[in-house]
C-alpha cells in the first residue's frame, strides 16, 4: 500500500470520530442556571400572548373571509395564508415544553416534526403571498376586475402545488433532525437534545442555499416585481381620472380605490413577512457557518427570541388584514352585539356592497 493510501485510510476514522464528537447546536434545549424559573416564565408569557392573539386573529379572519358570498382566487389564497399561520403557531406548545424541561423529552417523532412543520408553514406563507401578488397583477393588467376568475379546480390545483412543493422542500429537516445526547455548557451531565445532523456538510450547504434561494429570495423577487407593476398601473390610472367624470366612471373610481386598499394590505403583509422572517433565515445560515468556525458562538436563548419574533408574524398578519380591510365587518359585529337596532341597519345597507367585495377573483 502506498504511503498516500495508508495516510488516507488512517485519516478516515479520525474524520468520522471528529464528526461524531462535534458539538452540535441544541436549538431550543438550554441550561439556564439559577434564573431558570424566571427566564422560563418570561418566555412562556411572551409565547402564550403571541399564541392567543394569533389564534384569535386568524380564526376571526378566516370566518370573515369565508362568510363572503363571492370568494375568488385571492380570497382562497388569503384563507390559505391564515391556515399556514395557524399551523405555524401549533409548534409553540412544543417549544415551551422544551424551554421548561431544558432537555428534549418529547421523543424522536416530535423532534422530526417540529422544525418540519415550522419550515413547511413558512414556505407556504411566502409562496401564498407570491401567488396572491401574481394573481392580482394578472387581473389588473388584463382588466379582469369584473371577469370570473379561476374555477374551483384551478384553485385547488394551485393550493395543492403550494403545499406539495413546500412539504417536499422541507422534507430533509424531517429526516435529519434527531435526538442525541450532548453535554451543554452549565450542565453536569449529558442531556438529550433535538438537533440537525446532516450526513455530509456539502449536502447541508447545498440544501440551505437552495432553500433560501427558491423559497425566500425568488418568491420575494416575484412579489416585488408584481407589486411594482401594480403600483405603476394604479398611479397611471389615477392620473387619467378627472373631476368631471360620469356616474359610471365614478363607480370605477370606487372599485379602483378598493383594489388599492387590497394592494396596500397585501404589500404590508409581504413587508412584515420579510422583516420578521429575515432574522431566522440569517440565524440558520450562521448555524451553518458554525460548522466551519467553532469559535462562532450562537446562544440557544438568542435562537429562541429570534423564533419568538418570527412567531409574532402569525399574530401580526390577521391584525393588519382586519384593520385595513375588515373594519366595516368588525363595526357591524360590534354594533349587532351592543346595539341590535343599529346593527340591523348596517346589515341591511351592507348587502348592496357585497358585489364590490375587496376580495375579488
Swiss-Prot record:
Residues 67-77, 134-156, 226-268, 317-361 are cytoplasmic. One of its GO terms (molecular function) is arrestin family protein binding. It comes from the Eukaryota. Phosphorylated at two clusters of Ser and Thr residues located in the intracellular C-terminus, a prerequisite for FFAR4 internalization via an ARRB2-dependent pathway. InterPro entries: GPCR_Rhodpsn, GPCR_Rhodpsn_7TM. Belongs to the G-protein coupled receptor 1 family. This is Free fatty acid receptor 4. It comes from Homo sapiens (Human). The lineage of its organism: Eukaryota, Metazoa, Chordata, Craniata, Vertebrata. The gene is FFAR4.
Amino acid at each position: 500500500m502506498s504511503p498516500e493510501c495508508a495516510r488516507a485510510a488512517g485519516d478516515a476514522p479520525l474524520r468520522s470520530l471528529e464528526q461524531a464528537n462535534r458539538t452540535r447546536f441544541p436549538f431550543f434545549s438550554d441550561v439556564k442556571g439559577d434564573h431558570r424559573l424566571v427566564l422560563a416564565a418570561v418566555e412562556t408569557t411572551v409565547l402564550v400572548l403571541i399564541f392567543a392573539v394569533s389564534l384569535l386573529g386568524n380564526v376571526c379572519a378566516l370566518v370573515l373571509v369565508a362568510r363572503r358570498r363571492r370568494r375568488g382566487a385571492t380570497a382562497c389564497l388569503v384563507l390559505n395564508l391564515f391556515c399556514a399561520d395557524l399551523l405555524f403557531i401549533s409548534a409553540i406548545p412544543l417549544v415551551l415544553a422544551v424551554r421548561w424541561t431544558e432537555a428534549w423529552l418529547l421523543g424522536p417523532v416530535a423532534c422530526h416534526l417540529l422544525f418540519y412543520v415550522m419550515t413547511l408553514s413558512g414556505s407556504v406563507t411566502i409562496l401564498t403571498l407570491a401567488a396572491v401578488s401574481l394573481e392580482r397583477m394578472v387581473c389588473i393588467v388584463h382588466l379582469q376586475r369584473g371577469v370570473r376568475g379561476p374555477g374551483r379546480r384551478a384553485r385547488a390545483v394551485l393550493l395543492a402545488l403550494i403545499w406539495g412543493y413546500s412539504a417536499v422542500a422541507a422534507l430533509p429537516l424531517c429526516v435529519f433532525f434527531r435526538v442525541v445526547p450532548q453535554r451543554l455548557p452549565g450542565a453536569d451531565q449529558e442531556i438529550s437534545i433535538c438537533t440537525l445532523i446532516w450526513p455530509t456538510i456539502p449536502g447541508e450547504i447545498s440544501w440551505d442555499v437552495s432553500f433560501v434561494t427558491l423559497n425566500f429570495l425568488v418568491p420575494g423577487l416575484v412579489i416585488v416585481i408584481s407589486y411594482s407593476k401594480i403600483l405603476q398601473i394604479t398611479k397611471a390610472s389615477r392620473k387619467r381620472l378627472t373631476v368631471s367624470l360620469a356616474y359610471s366612471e365614478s363607480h370605477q373610481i370606487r372599485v379602483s380605490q378598493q383594489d388599492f386598499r387590497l394592494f396596500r394590505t397585501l404589500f404590508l403583509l409581504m413587508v412584515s413577512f420579510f422583516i420578521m422572517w429575515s432574522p431566522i433565515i440569517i440565524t440558520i445560515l450562521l448555524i451553518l457557518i458554525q460548522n466551519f468556525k467553532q469559535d462562532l458562538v450562537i446562544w440557544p436563548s438568542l435562537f429562541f427570541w429570534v423564533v419568538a419574533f418570527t412567531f409574532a408574524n402569525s399574530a401580526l398578519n390577521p391584525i393588519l388584514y382586519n384593520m385595513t380591510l375588515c373594519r366595516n365587518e368588525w363595526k357591524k359585529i360590534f354594533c349587532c352585539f351592543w346595539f341590535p337596532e343599529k346593527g340591523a341597519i348596517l346589515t341591511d345597507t351592507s348587502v348592496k356592497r357585497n358585489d364590490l367585495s375587496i376580495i375579488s377573483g
